[in-house]
Amino acid sequence: MAELHSDANNINKDTALDEKGNAPNDRTKPPNQHDILTGSRADGTAFIGGSGGGVPFPDMTCGNWTKGTAEGSAMVGHFDRSGPVTASWANSWNSSHPTIGCSMEKIRPTGGDGRLYCFAAD
């Protein structure tokens, strides 16, 4: 887990494939699908406040992945490690920015397609 959340991880647009082994569209290919739902901070831990909301962060998991409405938000990462600015958070694979809602209509405008990461252990 430590390597996964370190600079040594190998998550990028060549290795982050979908369930069929295909690369999702990155920022350069319409429709942009580079936002991956994670709900986590850069170190892989949950935001303080959790699915019940609260201080200092509101819910960042769309109600523990149960909401499909315009309300709420989830943290996403960029599988292609490419954001609109060069700041490290914008290029994070797991903690780049929140969605503007929890419905697909609110997830797609910022570059999402409702995708999640899945990992297999060796």
Feature locations, PLM:
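Secreted/extracellular ectodomain signature
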Residues: M1-D122
